[in-house]
A protein has these predicted regions:
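Membrane-interface helix-loop junctions in multi-pass transporters/channels
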Residues: 1-117
Length: 117
């Protein structure tokens, strides 16, 4: 039952994050006169700010709501942008001083993602 509750919480956050991404991207794209993908850049950076705020808010808090953290970090940010997760994982590798893994992860993600497209 707990897995179902967690899954539904994350799904709701993901749905809201996806809609927020669509609306913000549409708003920015309609007001932009350049071919530069400004809306994607804004969404990705904003997603990083949100996930950073969530982890800072809930870090080392014993009474923090696990459900709210999952809703925001995994659900909303996951639906809003996967770039925030990539950046958070990269930052974690940096904090752990796993610099070789960090360089490999960033390089592989960008290069493999580029060629996969």
């Amino acid at each position: 039952m707990m897995l179902l509750k967690t899954t539904l919480i994350i799904a709701l956050g993901g749905a809201l994050g996806s809609v927020a991404r669509f609306m913000l991207s549409k708003l920015i794209s309609e007001s932009s006169t350049t071919s530069f993908p400004l809306s994607t850049l804004v969404v990705n950076v904003l997603g990083c700010l949100i996930i950073g705020f969530v982890y800072a808010l809930f870090d080392n808090k014993e009474n923090a709501s696990v459900a709210l953290k999952q809703f925001l970090a995994i659900g909303f940010c996951g639906g809003f942008t996967t770039f925030s997760t990539f950046s958070n994982e990269s930052f974690n590798l940096y904090q752990l001083q796993h610099f070789t893994q960090l360089a490999l992860y960033i390089t592989a993600s960008v290069v493999l993602g580029f060629f996969a497209i």
